[in-house]
A protein has these predicted regions:
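Fe-S-dependent hydro-lyases/dehydratases of central metabolism
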Residues: 1-638
Length: 638
C-alpha cells in the first residue's frame, strides 16, 4: 500500500530508495521556465552541448519581465524565443499568461513529473502530478536528460473534511496550514491532500493550495486525480490526458494534519511573512489603500468570478486603488465573453495584462506607509517595491469586499451571489509556438545585455575569509537577490546584478566583497527561503563568496549553493551563531576531508575560537563542490 506521492516517485525513480531522508534521483517528464530565471537556465543548457531537449515536454514562458522600459527585457525575450525554437521547446509569448496558470490549463498531466525554474511550480500538482520548483541549472540538467537529485521527502497527509462556507476560500486553507506549521514547517516534506473535503474543491481551488505549499518550504504538495480533475480537463479539451490516481486505502503517512473546512473563517497573512496569520475579523476596520487581485495564486476563472460577484453594481472606495490581473489569456477572454471584465472596469478597477506584475514588484508599488491587500503568495519586506508599505495576503473575496468598503472587511458579513456559470474554457493556443522543424537553421539572438555565464573555480582545500555579512532568521532570496522593475532586467547580466545583492540589508555589499576578496556569509534559520532564483547563489559566487554558514537552509537554495560551488554549512551547536561578528576572520581547513566525514571545524581566527559544523550534502554534492559547481562537474564527466 502506497501513498500517491510515492506511487509517482516510484515510477520515476532512477537511483536510491524511497525512504524519507535518503538521497534519490528521479526522471523528469516535463520542464517549465519563466523569463526571469529562464535566460540563465538556457545559457546553462547551451553550455552542456545537447542538441535537443530530452524531456517529453519543455515550455518557456514569458511572464515576469514584461515592463519593457528599456531594450534589456525585449532582448531577453528574443533570446528565449530563438532558443526555444532551436532546441525543441514550446514558447509562450508575453501576454499569454503566468507560467503556472497556463501550464495547469494546457500542459499538466496526472501522474507526470514536472520541474520548473520557479518556486511555485507545485501549482500543477493540483492535477495529481509531482511538480517541483528548482534552480535553473537543475531544470537545464533535466532538459539534458539528467535525473533530478533530492532528499526523499516525508509525506504529510492533510485530511480535509466538510465544505467551505460562504465567503471562505481555498486561500484560507493554506493560510491555516501556514499558521499551524510556519514557513519552515514543510521543509523535507510533501503535503498530500485526502478526505471528503477534497471532493468539494475544484482544480483551481486545489491549485491555490499547492501553489502556496511553497511558502511552507515544502518539496511539493499534491491532490488526487479524480472526477473533479476529469471535468477540468474536459473543459480544457484535454480529457484524453486524464487518469485516475489516488493513495491506497490504509497507506502510510509520516504525519497527519486535519482541517475541518466547516470551521474555517477568512484569514490574512500580515506583514512581513506568509505565516503571520490573523483572522480577518480581528483586522476588520483597518483602512486600506490598495487592493491587488491576481498572481499565480488567485488569478483563475473562479477566483475572478467570485471577486466580481462582490463588486458587481458597486464602486470601489475613494481611498482605494484596485488592480486586477487575470492569470491567463484564456481566463481574460472568458471574462470578456461573459461580461465580467465590464464589471471590473465599471467598479473602478484597473486591468493589468496577464503576467506576474505587482507580485514580483513589477509595477503597482503602493504609496508610502500604505496598507495593501493582495491575493498573492508572498509579502516579504520590500517585495512590493515600497519598503514602508504593509502587505497583507488575503483571498479574492476579502480583497473585493475591502475594495468596496475601503477598510478590511470580512466577506462572510456580506450578501452576494457566488454562483456563476460553469466554465466552458476559451481555448486558443495561438500564442504558444511549437519549436522549429528545421532547428539547424535557427540562429540564437543575443542582445548586448546577455553576458557570458560566470563559472566558479574548483574548491580550495582551505577557505580563509572574513564574514562579510551576518543575517537573522528567515532571510529570503528576495533579500539576497532582489526582484522588481529596477533589478529584474539584469538577470542575464550577473556582473550588473551582483551590485544589487543584499541592497536592502547592507548597501554596497558588493564593494565590501571586492575590498575583502570575497568572503563568508553567516545567517540564522531557514536561509534562502522563498523564490527558487538561482541568482541568489550565482551573484554571491561572482562576488567571491566561498561558504555560507547558517542554522538551517531552505531546500531549493541549498541545492543552488551546491550547483554553483558555494560550501553550505550548518552549526552543530546553534548557539555558536551568537559568537560570530561581521568581519571576523574564519578559516575552514581540510575541506577535502568531506569525503570522509561531513563534519568540519571552523576556526574563528579573530576570536581564537572553534565551531563544529556539518555539511548537509550528499556524496555526489561533494564531487560537484570540489569541481566548482555543477557545470564544471558535467563538463569533467564528458
Amino acid at each position: 500500500m502506497q501513498n500517491l506521492t510515492y506511487k509517482i516517485l516510484e515510477k520515476h525513480l532512477l537511483k536510491g530508495k524511497l525512504e524519507a531522508g535518503q538521497p534519490i534521483e528521479i526522471k523528469m517528464d516535463q520542464t517549465l521556465t519563466q523569463d526571469a530565471t529562464g535566460t540563465m537556465a538556457y545559457m546553462q543548457f547551451e553550455a552542456m552541448g545537447v542538441k535537443k531537449v530530452k524531456t517529453e515536454l519543455s515550455v518557456s514562458y514569458v511572464d515576469h519581465n514584461t515592463l519593457q522600459n528599456g531594450f534589456m527585457n525585449a532582448d531577453d525575450h528574443a533570446y528565449l524565443q530563438s532558443v526555444a525554437s532551436k532546441y525543441g521547446i514550446y514558447f509562450s509569448k508575453p501576454g499569454n499568461g503566468i507560467c503556472h496558470q497556463v501550464h495547469l490549463e494546457r500542459f499538466a498531466k496526472p501522474g507526470k513529473t514536472l520541474i520548473g525554474s520557479d518556486s511555485h511550480t507545485p501549482t500543477s500538482s493540483a492535477m495529481g502530478c509531482i511538480a517541483i520548483g528548482a534552480g535553473g541549472l537543475d531544470v537545464a540538467k533535466a532538459m539534458a536528460g539528467i535525473g533530478y537529485r533530492l532528499t526523499c521527502p516525508k509525506v504529510v497527509e492533510v485530511k480535509l473534511t466538510g465544505t467551505l462556507a460562504h465567503g471562505v476560500s481555498s486561500k484560507d486553507i493554506i493560510l491555516k496550514l501556514l499558521e499551524l506549521l510556519s514557513v519552515k514547517g514543510g521543509v523535507g516534506k510533501v503535503f498530500e491532500y485526502t478526505g471528503e473535503g477534497v471532493k468539494n474543491l475544484s482544480v483551481y481551488q486545489r491549485a491555490t493550495i499547492t501553489n502556496m505549499g511553497a511558502e511552507l518550504g515544502a518539496t511539493t504538495s499534491i491532490f488526487p486525480s479524480d472526477e473533479v480533475t476529469r471535468e477540468f480537463l474536459k473543459c480544457q479539451q484535454r480529457e484524453s490526458d486524464y487518469i485516475a490516481l489516488s493513495a491506497d486505502e490504509g497507506c502510510h503517512y509520516d504525519e497527519t494534519v486535519e482541517i475541518n473546512l466547516d470551521e474555517l473563517t477568512p484569514l490574512a497573512a500580515c506583514p512581513n511573512s506568509p505565516d503571520a496569520i490573523k483572522n480577518v475579523s480581528e483586522l476588520a476596520g483597518m483602512k486600506v489603500d490598495q487592493v491587488a487581485i491576481g498572481s499565480c495564486t488567485n488569478s483563475g476563472y473562479e477566483d475572478l468570478m467570485k471577486a466580481a460577484a462582490i463588486l458587481k453594481g458597486k464602486k470601489i472606495a475613494h481611498n482605494v486603488s484596485l488592480v486586477v490581473s487575470p492569470g491567463s489569456r484564456q481566463v481574460l477572454m472568458k471574462l470578456i465573453e461573459n461580461g465580467t471584465l465590464a464589471t471590473f472596469v465599471s467598479c473602478g478597477a484597473r486591468i493589468l495584462e496577464c503576467t506576474c506584475g505587482p507580485c514580483i514588484g513589477m509595477g503597482q508599488s503602493p504609496k508610502s506607509d500604505a496598507v495593501s491587500l493582495r491575493t498573492f503568495n508572498r509579502n516579504f519586506y520590500g517585495r512590493s517595491g515600497t519598503l514602508s508599505a504593509g502587505i497583507y495576503l488575503v483571498s479574492p473575496e476579502v480583497a473585493a469586499a475591502s475594495a468596496i468598503t475601503g477598510v478590511i472587511t470580512d466577506p462572510t458579513t456580506l450578501e452576494y451571489a457566488d454562483e456563476f456559470e460553469k466554465e466552458q474554457s476559451y481555448i486558443d493556443d495561438s500564442l504558444i509556438y511549437a519549436p522549429s522543424k528545421d532547428p539547424e537553421h535557427v540562429e540564437i539572438v543575443r542582445g548586448p545585455n546577455i553576458k557570458p555565464l560566470p563559472v566558479n573555480t574548483p574548491m580550495d582545500s582551505t577557505i580563509d575569509k572574513k564574514v562579510v555579512i551576518k543575517l537573522p532568521d528567515n532571510i529570503t532570496t528576495d533579500h539576497i537577490a532582489p526582484a522588481g522593475a529596477k533589478v529584474l532586467p539584469y538577470r542575464s547580466n550577473i556582473e550588473k546584478l551582483s551590485t544589487f545583492v543584499f541592497e536592502n540589508n547592507k548597501p554596497h555589499f558588493d564593494e565590501v566583497c571586492k575590498e575583502n576578496n570575497g568572503g563568508i556569509i553567516v545567517a540564522g534559520e531557514n536561509y534562502g527561503q522563498g523564490s527558487s532564483r538561482e541568482h541568489a547563489a550565482l551573484a554571491p559566487m561572482y562576488l567571491g563568496i566561498k561558504a555560507v554558514l547558517t542554522k538551517s537552509f531552505a531546500r531549493i537554495h541549498l541545492a543552488n549553493l551546491v550547483n554553483f560551488g558555494l560550501l553550505p554549512l550548518i552549526f552543530i551547536d546553534k548557539s555558536d551563531y551568537d559568537k560570530i561578528d561581521e568581519m571576523d576572520e574564519l578559516k575552514i581547513e581540510n575541506v577535502n576531508s568531506l569525503y570522509d566525514s561531513l563534519d568540519l571545524i571552523v576556526e574563528n581566527v579573530t576570536k581564537n575560537e572553534t565551531y563544529k559544523v556539518h555539511a548537509p550534502i550528499s556524496q555526489e554534492d561533494i564531487d560537484i563542490l570540489m569541481a566548482g559547481g555543477a557545470l564544471n562537474y558535467i563538463r569533467n564527466q564528458q
